[in-house]
């Protein structure tokens, strides 16, 4: 019996793209109207260039919750943070925008992929979310096998 591939068995960049595509096609995810104006953190000068950045960030948060759960907004702010350029002084680490991450988590809660942890220690992936992510990973694995074979 062959084990179904999980999110951990596939390339992280590709699975995030596949999940983002799934979220966009499904129509369940509503992009906030402020998404074209916002910066993703204090470390950025401009808003994201990619018009689908909200789907990608939401997919990345879902993958992160699959890998390490429970996780809160503060931990995700550290994950998505970066170096703040301060001119001639040395760079300094700064966290990402908490509002963007919070809205992504609320979006995942609305489609029933994520729920709040009973102890209040962040959020966890639901059984439905885990099942959908595993299904996307197995479809991705099948598509790459088909294209790689001669």
UniProtKB/Swiss-Prot annotation:
Q: Report the GO terms under cellular component.
A: cytosolic small ribosomal subunit
Output the Gene Ontology terms for molecular function: RNA binding; structural constituent of ribosome
Which keywords does this Swiss-Prot/TrEMBL entry list? Answer: Ribonucleoprotein, Ribosomal protein
Gene3D superfamilies this protein is in? Winged helix-like DNA-binding domain superfamily/Winged helix DNA-binding domain
Q: Which Pfam families match?
A: Ribosomal_S19e
Supply the PROSITE patterns for this chain.
Answer: RIBOSOMAL_S19E
Q: What GO biological process, any one, is recorded here? A: ribosomal small subunit assembly
Name the family the entry cites: Belongs to the eukaryotic ribosomal protein eS19 family.
Descriptive protein name: Small ribosomal subunit protein eS19S
Q: What organism is the protein native to?
A: Ascaris suum (Pig roundworm)
- Supply the gene name: RPS19S
